[in-house]
């Protein structure tokens, strides 16, 4: 069902891509890239369990991961096609129920209406199978882009999103979404971006009423659960001897179902620097503060799906080229979060070493 839905969601976009590619442009310039990675990992929390002071954490486990990626771009006289696809797999030794297969893809077709205005369509899909977080995330949007010069770029988009969470179908939702992205480059090293997105989420279940003693009666309310997801923020980027990035994002999820509302502030930073012996160091970290006005009724697994790996994280990677197309890489990452009121905590560390091939 989901794979069929993915194909159907991309069918209109594929038609537009073909129409644009078959335009009056006599020829097109094509470019592409391939990338593959193989890594050995040590995972301290493969099942992604929450624990407290009285609960023993899961055992450490080894895993082997493979990742393949392909991307391409076609440039015509007044049109451009961009696409990418990734396929990843992870195999554990002890926690074999956490073995995963992840696919993701995105396509974009744009057409210039003049020297500074353009329109286009884009679509994306991600499908994760296996483990405790099996889901599919689909979306298509149309956008209008304004770029009067190399300094300023503004994109406004509108479309629809569908999310399917297999372990708990009550978390499935769909609905329209709109967004805006603006970027201003002060010079070749400094740039500032602002962004905002809003998604109306309609679920197939009834909303939860406020429990007795909190201003309402227990049980379910008539109608369907409806959420509004708002995200807004800004980011600064510096490109020089050291690459730096700093992002602040605010997210508000308001729901007519009791216990599903949350507000989140998140700050993230990343850096990259060249070290001696042709070694590159990449580092990334994030801190989050989340408020739950009604307390928590959200499933911890769903929280991790939304945030990918929890609220707070720190990771680092060292890479050194062995040849023109092969790199040796070593990485470490830690992710953690804490749920208020019940004192449950989530902590996970992953160590890895492997190779990345590029073409």
Regions found by a protein language model. Give the residues of each.
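Bacterial N-terminal signal peptides that target proteins for export
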Residues: 1-13
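Bacterial N-terminal signal peptides
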Residues: 11-21
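Gram-negative and organellar
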Residues: 27-359
């Amino acid at each position: 069902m989901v794979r069929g839905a993915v194909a159907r969601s991309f069918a209109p976009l594929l038609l537009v891509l073909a129409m644009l590619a078959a335009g009056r442009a006599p020829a097109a310039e094509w470019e592409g890239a391939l990338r593959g990675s193989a890594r050995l990992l040590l995972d301290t929390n493969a099942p992604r369990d929450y624990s407290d002071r009285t609960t023993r954490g899961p055992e450490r486990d080894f895993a082997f991961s493979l990742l393949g990626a392909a991307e391409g771009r076609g440039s015509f006289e007044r049109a451009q096609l961009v696409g990418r696809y990734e396929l990843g797999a992870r195999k554990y030794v002890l926690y074999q129920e956490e073995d995963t297969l992840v696919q993701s893809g995105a396509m974009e077709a744009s057409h210039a209406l003049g020297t500074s205005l353009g329109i286009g369509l884009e679509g994306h899909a991600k499908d994760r199978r296996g483990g405790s977080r099996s889901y599919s995330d689909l979306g298509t949007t149309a956008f209008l882009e304004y770029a009067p010069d190399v300094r300023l770029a503004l994109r406004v988009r509108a479309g629809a999103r569908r999310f399917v969470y297999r372990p708990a179908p009550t978390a499935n939702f769909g609905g329209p979404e709109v967004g805006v992205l603006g970027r201003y480059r002060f010079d070749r090293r400094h740039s500032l971006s602002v962004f905002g997105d809003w998604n109306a989420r309609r679920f197939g279940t009834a909303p939860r009423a406020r429990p007795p003693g909190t201003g309402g009666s227990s049980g379910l309310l008539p109608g369907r659960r409806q959420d509004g997801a708002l995200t807004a923020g800004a980011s600064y980027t510096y490109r020089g001897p050291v690459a730096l990035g700093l992002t602040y994002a605010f997210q508000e999820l308001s729901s007519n179902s009791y216990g599903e509302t949350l507000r989140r502030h998140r700050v993230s930073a990343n850096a990259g620097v060249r070290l001696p012996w042709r070694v590159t160091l990449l580092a990334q970290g994030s801190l989050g503060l989340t408020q739950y006005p009604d307390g928590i009724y959200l499933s911890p697994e769903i929280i991790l799906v939304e945030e990918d790996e929890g609220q707070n994280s720190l990771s680092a990677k060292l890479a050194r080229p062995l040849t023109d197309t092969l790199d040796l890489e070593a990485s470490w990452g830690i992710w953690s979060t804490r749920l208020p009121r019940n004192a449950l905590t989530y902590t996970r560390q992953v160590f890895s070493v492997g190779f990345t091939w590029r073409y």
